[in-house]
From Swiss-Prot:
The enzyme's E.C. designation: 2.7.7.85
Keyword Ribonucleoprotein carried by entry: no
Name recorded for this polypeptide: Diadenylate cyclase
Key word Magnesium present: no
Length: 309
């Protein structure tokens, strides 16, 4: 069984590199049972077992699961130095699974910003298929905490749509258009209110079309239109309703110095409606996510492929 050896070598790697924690992800709990087989003491063996090494180095064992039944079972065992974590959402790729586990562990103060961990993970949504060992510096994930907190307030369709928008924004921020950076805004959700607080700058290219943000052809069209003024309006379900919308700015909105009208509009629409706004900066491709008038996440897509790819 490959999973058994992945766990074994992951534990040994955690010891060898002096990691602060070993993190494993499990759906059904079977991987956790395999893990426990390495952590049992053998009083009759003269061999120094992995348990002795891990205990000596004070390596924390973190077991993360999106399954409530599995989480309750692991928690009820109350094993020393084993920290169970419940993850609300099932993620779509290995990097996102690990990021989610780290963010939850940070919020629970199991991990610290300067920690280094070894994570063992497998094919998403496929129980028992552990196949990957990763060494991760926790500080690289600290900035994603507020983004994950936002995700936790969304249902599955909203979360899926927002991820797709951020992915597309990252691509636009990296690639630009015809070798030049372009700036744009995406507004997701609370569509009726958003439309009432905006006005068209161009004829709507998506009128009469059932355009979806998950359609590669539609994403290509959005990239072509990304250099025009105004915002793309997208529903919670991912339907692209309009492009080139001028967003009204209402009330007092505070944004960091150096940000321009595009970011002010994004902050305002996210404050005055229940929408989430995502911007791409024309000055450098920086991607920012706005909610309730505040920046909850920002990243440079040229430096970070991020966990959505």
């Amino acid at each position: 069984m490959i999973a058994k050896y992945i766990i074994k070598h992951g534990l040994e790697l955690a010891y060898d590199i002096k990691a602060d924690a070993f993190m494993i992800f499990t759906e059904t709990g079977k991987s956790y049972e395999l893990l426990k087989s390495f952590l049992k003491k053998d009083e009759h063996s003269g061999i120094i077992k992995i348990l002795d090494k891990i205990s000596h180095k004070n390596v924390k064992i973190i077991v993360a699961t999106p399954n409530q039944v599995t989480y309750k079972k692991i928690s009820s065992e109350n094993e020393e130095n084993i920290y169970p974590i419940f993850i609300k959402h099932r993620e779509d790729n290995r990097c996102m699974i690990i990021s989610s586990g780290i963010v939850h562990a940070l919020k629970m103060k199991i991990l610290k910003e300067n920690n280094k961990i070894v994570a063992v993970v497998g094919e998403p949504k496929t129980p028992g298929k552990l196949d990957t060992i990763m060494v991760v510096n926790v500080k690289e994930h600290v900035k994603t905490i507020t983004l994950y907190e936002l995700f936790e307030t969304l249902d599955e369709k909203q979360k899926r749509t927002l991820k797709e928008i951020i992915k597309l924004a990252m691509e636009i921020g990296r690639e630009g258009r015809e070798g030049e950076y372009v700036g744009t805004i995406f507004v997701m959700g609370d569509t009726l209110n958003v439309m009432s607080m905006s006005k068209p700058l161009i004829l709507n290219p998506f009128a009469g079309h059932n355009a979806s943000i998950f359609d590669e052809n539609v994403k290509g069209t959005i990239k072509e239109l990304s250099s025009i003024d105004g915002a793309f309006i997208i529903t919670d379900e991912g339907k692209v309703v309009s492009a080139g919308r001028f967003l009204e700015i209402k009330g007092d909105v505070n944004i960091p110095k150096g940000l321009g009208a595009r970011h002010l509009a994004a902050a305002s629409i996210s404050k005055n409606t229940n929408a989430i706004a995502v911007t791409v900066s024309q000055s450098g491709g920086i991607v920012r996510v706005f909610k309730d008038g505040k920046i909850v996440f920002e990243t440079d897509p040229r430096a970070n492929i991020l966990f959505f790819d």
